[in-house]
């Protein structure tokens, strides 16, 4: 038996995509956001209470968040309410919209698809955890490259107890698209697999060429068309760190999301490295499901389930960090400043390559 709130969310997902509902894990089906508890009471009081709102565990003083001067004196230009109060579990609305706008700016192909609005996570690692909780059961197959970040092992081998299946990341000096194809070919029709792809790749730094990205997307869609049920997590932690003009500039998510009902796409990304704010811990998770409407029942339910997982673990992510990132994204100099840092990083990359040219013994390392 599910909680009535979970039942309601499950019905919203099934109404638009029975296939997407079938991909949820047992926890994914059980989880819900407690929309009728203290949080909804507080939201209602915020709108309707004329003088007093005693519904949530914060204290006010002089119509602002009660605070210590020794704290707020360190934050010039930020009000106590922006720095110290709780953010919604799904994230500040203005940040979610600002990140959505950034996704569309960076990925023009996304203009043709309808995705969820990004939900704010406590960094990219947290987004990986949310994705696993929503879609991976013990014993499920998780497909990922042999060159991978060790956090995948913690999340999917240990936390969810999935069966990890590795494909060789490289085919010579190129992305091993045939290896992905071969790994997916072992998934029988009707069976679910959770696929993790990360570009630029950690630890190799490799970013697919444009034609490799197109071929990889087609392989994923081909297997969805033949009946494999795929949840594809695109880990865009290092998005934007492209140092070769031939590299695919748009996220793989933009090529595969909303293209087939047997392929549920997830984009995990973060301000961490895109905005050079490693310790602020602001990440995002976005869903792409075929035939789901932006703002429609399915995405509202998916966002609520993600918010429920956040509520159950960290409750909500730092409002102060979210305010800082939201203001940065709203700054008219944001894209120019980001491009300048990417230029510096690109110069460092090329210098390493130049030095290694005189050391052929390291040719396989870079």
Which residues are covered by each model-predicted region?
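N-terminal small-domain helix-loop-helix segment of the aminotransferase-like
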Residues: 2-11, 15, 26-122
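Conserved core segment of the aminotransferase class I/II
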Residues: 4-16, 258-343
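Short glycine/proline-rich turn/loop motifs
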Residues: 21-22, 77-81, 196-204, 305-306, ...
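Hydrophobic/aromatic beta-strand patches that form the interior of the parallel beta-sheet core
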Residues: 52-54, 119, 143, 165, ...
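Short, solvent-exposed loop/turn segments at secondary-structure junctions
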Residues: 57-61, 125, 149-150, 200-203, ...
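Conserved core of the PLP fold type I
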Residues: 82-232, 239-259
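PLP-dependent aminotransferase class I/II
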Residues: 326-366
């Amino acid at each position: 038996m599910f909680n009535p709130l979970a039942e309601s969310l499950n019905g919203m997902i099934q109404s638009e995509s029975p296939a997407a509902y079938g991909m949820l894990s047992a926890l994914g089906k059980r989880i819900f956001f407690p929309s009728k508890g203290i949080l909804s009471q507080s939201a209602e009081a915020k709108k309707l209470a004329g003088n007093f709102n005693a519904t949530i565990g914060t204290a006010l003083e002089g119509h602002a968040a009660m605070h210590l001067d020794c704290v707020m004196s360190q934050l010039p230009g930020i009000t106590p309410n922006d720095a110290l109060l709780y953010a919604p579990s799904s994230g500040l609305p203005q940040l979610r919209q600002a990140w959505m706008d950034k996704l569309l700016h960076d990925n023009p192909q996304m203009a043709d698809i309808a995705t969820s609005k990004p939900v704010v996570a406590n960094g990219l690692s947290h987004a990986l955890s949310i994705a696993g909780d929503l879609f991976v059961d013990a014993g499920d197959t998780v497909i990922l490259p042999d060159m991978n970040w060790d956090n995948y092992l913690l999340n999917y081998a240990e936390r969810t107890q999935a069966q990890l299946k590795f494909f060789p990341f490289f085919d010579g000096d190129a992305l091993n698209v045939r290896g992905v194809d071969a790994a997916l070919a072992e998934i029988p029709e009707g069976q679910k697999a959770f696929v993790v792809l990360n570009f630029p790749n950690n630890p190799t730094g490799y970013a697919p060429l444009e034609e490799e990205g197109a071929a990889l997307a087609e392989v994923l869609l081909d297997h969805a068309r033949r009946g494999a049920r795929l949840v594809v997590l695109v880990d865009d932690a290092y998005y934007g760190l492209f140092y070769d003009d031939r590299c695919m500039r748009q996220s793989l998510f933009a090529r595969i999301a909303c293209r087939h009902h047997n392929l549920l796409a997830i984009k995990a990304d973060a301000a961490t490295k895109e905005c050079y704010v490693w310790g602020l811990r602001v990440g995002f998770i976005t869903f792409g499901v075929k035939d789901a409407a932006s703002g429609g029942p399915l995405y509202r339910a998916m966002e609520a389930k993600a918010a429920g997982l956040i509520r159950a673990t960290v409750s909500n992510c730092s409002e102060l960090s979210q305010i800082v990132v939201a203001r940065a994204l709203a700054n008219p100099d944001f894209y120019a400043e980001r491009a300048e840092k990417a230029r510096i990083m690109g110069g460092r990359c090329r210098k390493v390559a130049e030095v290694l040219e005189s050391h052929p013994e390291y040719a396989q390392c870079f």
